[in-house]
Design a protein with these regions (language model features):
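N-terminal secretory signal peptides that target proteins for export/translocation
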Residues: 1-8
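Short, intrinsically disordered low-complexity segments
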Residues: 8-10, 141
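Bacterial N-terminal signal peptides
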Residues: 11-25
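Exported/periplasmic ABC-transporter solute-binding proteins
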Residues: 26-62, 68-71, 75, 79-85, ...
Length: 275
């Protein structure tokens, strides 16, 4: 009886181990089988929307892989990723948020790099004015900037105001946009006479009526900390060859030229993110 019982136990245990092994194999296989026909979902900081649309279109033509963009402030996208948003790649407007995602285990270590160096502009939709002097003299009702808690360009705008010793003088006139895109719209719509925006936005809107009637001051780089923008591969896409392929494409000469044509600074050796 004891031998029969032992034999049954061994068979039961062996069966359970077999089932467990098959289950684990199935899970591993499912994780490794990525649907490369599904859209690649990329979270993009608002300042980079115009060049990103061109780059996404070119990537789709080269690879056949569709791309879906989610455009918002870096802070908003960062929070969405932390709460499980289904993004494959994150293009932030700073280096801090991608690095924090790596530290939190939400992004792949070693995948982070600087794809652009942003520059700040003070824009007005009014023609034939000097935005710098208008700002210094306080001859405006409203000044639009992106929320510095969410958008690195908003933080850069705050730094510029400090450098210009205009923080107190402009405090009551500031209106905050959720992103640099909304700050731009505040100026374009006339809700604000002046706005700190990305140089790239001004260049992207170069043929629009709103810009052709406007005025711009490109701020000297010494008025704010460098806006080094990093990309990172998110953990959910670590086995997706298409996501890795896109990050390689973003570092290609074609991509670099496109990015620089939109007014972003060149990426020097010391401007690179973590590799």
């Amino acid at each position: 009886m004891l031998k029969i019982f032992s034999s049954l136990c061994l068979r039961t245990v062996s069966g359970l181990l077999l089932v467990l092994g098959l289950t684990l194999s199935a899970v591993a296989l499912a994780e490794s089988q990525v649907d490369n026909s599904a859209p690649l979902t990329i979270a993009v900081a608002a300042n980079f929307s115009a060049p990103m649309k061109l780059l996404a279109s070119e990537f789709e033509q080269q690879t056949g892989r569709p791309v879906r963009l989610s455009i918002a402030s870096s802070g908003k996208l960062f929070a969405q990723i932390q709460h499980g948003a289904p993004f494959d790649v994150f293009l932030s407007a700073d280096q801090d948020k991608p690095q924090r995602l790596v530290e939190q285990g939400l992004a792949v270590s070693g995948s982070q790099f600087t794809y652009a160096v942003g520059e700040l502009a003070l824009w007005s939709s009014q023609q034939h004015i000097d935005p710098e002097q208008t700002l210094r003299q306080g001859n405006f009702r409203k000044l639009a900037i992106a929320n510095p808690k969410l958008a690195p360009y908003g933080l850069a705008a705050e730094q510029a105001l400090v450098s210009l010793d205009l923080t107190e003088a402009s405090k009551s006139k500031i209106i905050f946009g959720e992103s640099i895109g909304q700050a731009f719209q505040f100026v374009a719509s006339g809700s604000a006479e002046l706005g700190f925006v990305a140089r790239a936005q001004v260049i992207a809107a170069g043929s629009s009526d709103s810009l052709s009637k406007g005025s711009v001051w490109f701020l000297p780089n010494n008025l704010y900390a460098p806006i080094r923008q990093d990309a990172v591969l998110l953990v959910r896409a670590k086995t997706d060859s298409g996501a890795g392929q896109f990050l390689e494409f973003l570092q290609s000469e074609y991509a670099k030229n496109t990015i620089q044509n939109f007014g972003y600074g060149s990426i020097s050796v010391d401007a690179k993110g973590s590799q």
